[in-house]
């Protein structure tokens, strides 16, 4: 019934504990238990897929009822923790809405958590012109509230209309 790809078997939510945007410890499993949770791995200085994906999810959430919005959490896990401090990550995510929070911390833990969901994350690369890029998968893993497992994955190119259609289905699963 989803516009995303259904996972069979579903993925278990990673046991990832990093620093949240409020500067306090944020445990992904504990903080999002029983909520529809969309998890994305990326970085705030990303020139393309990260801001557009967050923007599409934000636009889709704005079209939802309060009941759906209240049950959805979007967690952005940075793949560039050296530059994406909790404070800067929080400021960037605030532009997308109150449903968005971020996690920053040990890159090796981030890479392990991403890999457990079939998402690749590479170490950031510094280029001769001073820019830094972080190669990462562009998938959004959707965890359902009933069992806190990822049953659906969305790839790059998923539209805000696709998310808007699926969010009510995800929220009541």
Q: Residue spans of the language-model regions?
A:
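Conserved helix-turn-beta segment immediately C-terminal to the redox Cys motif
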Residues: 35-36, 52-76, 94
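Thiol-based oxidoreductase modules, predominantly thioredoxin-like and allied folds used
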Residues: 69-84, 100-110
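Extracytoplasmic
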Residues: 11-13, 33-36, 69-72, 84, ...
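Thiol-/selenol-based redox modules, centered on thioredoxin-like
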Residues: 127-173
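Short active-site neighborhood of thiol/selenol oxidoreductases, capturing the structured segment around
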Residues: 28-57
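N-terminal "domain-start" segment that seeds a small globular fold
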Residues: 1-30
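Hydrophobic beta-strand positions
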Residues: 17-21, 125, 142-143
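Short, internal strand/loop/helix patches
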Residues: 90-137
């Amino acid at each position: 019934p989803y516009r995303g790809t259904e996972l069979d078997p579903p993925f278990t939510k990673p046991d990832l504990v990093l620093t949240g945007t409020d500067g306090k410890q944020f445990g992904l499993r504990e903080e999002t238990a029983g909520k529809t949770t969309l998890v994305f791995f990326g970085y705030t200085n990303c020139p393309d897929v990260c801001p557009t994906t967050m923007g599409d999810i934000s636009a889709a959430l704005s079209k939802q009822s309060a009941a759906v919005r209240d049950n959805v959490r979007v967690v952005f896990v940075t793949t560039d923790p050296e530059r994406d401090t909790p404070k800067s990550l929080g400021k960037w995510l605030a532009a997308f809405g109150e449903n968005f929070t971020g996690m920053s911390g040990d890159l090796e833990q981030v890479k392990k958590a991403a890999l457990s969901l079939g998402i690749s994350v590479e170490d950031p690369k510094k280029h001769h012109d001073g820019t830094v890029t972080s190669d990462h998968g562009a998938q959004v893993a959707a965890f359902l509230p009933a069992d806190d497992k990822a049953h659906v994955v969305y790839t790059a190119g998923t539209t805000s209309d696709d998310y808007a259609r699926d969010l009510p289905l995800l929220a009541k699963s």
